[in-house]
Each structure stands twice: as structure tokens, then as C-alpha cells.
Amino acid sequence: MARKCFFTGKGPMVGNNVSHANNKTKKRSLPNLRTVRVKLEDGTTVKLRVAASTLRTMKKRS
């Protein structure tokens, strides 16, 4: 299962850890994904992986 938000497509980002000596090593920052149950119009429920920021936006706009 991919580490992506179902609605926004938000995925992992790549950056650098920079030490005091200016040595750089790669790091990945993963999105804050939550598994959410969504009820569809026909009454069935589906589990989706959604970013926490997307959940906040959904609550704000609903």
C-alpha cells in the first residue's frame, strides 16, 4: 500500500539532515496518514488512507 493520501495525493518528501560539520545525509519525511472509514451513499463503508491535514480541511468545509 502506497504512502499517499487518497484525496490529495500527498506523499513522502526527500530532504537533507545537515550536521554541524555540514555533512549531508538524505532523509524522508512521511505524510501523517490516518486510516478513515467513509460511508458511501449505498450504505457500504470503505477504509481510506487520508492525511491528517486533509481530515482537518474536510471537517472545516463540511
From Swiss-Prot:
- Name of protein: Large ribosomal subunit protein bL28
- This protein's UniProt keywords: Ribonucleoprotein, Ribosomal protein
Keyword Ribosomal protein set for record: yes
Describe the family membership recorded for this protein in Swiss-Prot or TrEMBL: Belongs to the bacterial ribosomal protein bL28 family.
Cystine links in this protein are none
> Coiled coil where?
none
- What species was this sequence derived from? Wolinella succinogenes (strain ATCC 29543 / DSM 1740 / CCUG 13145 / JCM 31913 / LMG 7466 / NCTC 11488 / FDC 602W)
* Listed GO biological process terms: translation
Q: Give one GO molecular function term.
A: structural constituent of ribosome
Q: What does UniProt give as GO cellular component?
A: ribonucleoprotein complex; ribosome
Fetch the InterPro entries from UniProt. Bacterial_rp_bL28, Ribosomal_bL28, Ribosomal_bL28/bL31-like_sf, Ribosomal_bL28_bact-type, Ribosomal_bL28_sf
Lineage of the source organism?
A: Bacteria, Pseudomonadati, Campylobacterota, Epsilonproteobacteria, Campylobacterales
Do you know which Pfam families this protein is assigned to? Ribosomal_L28
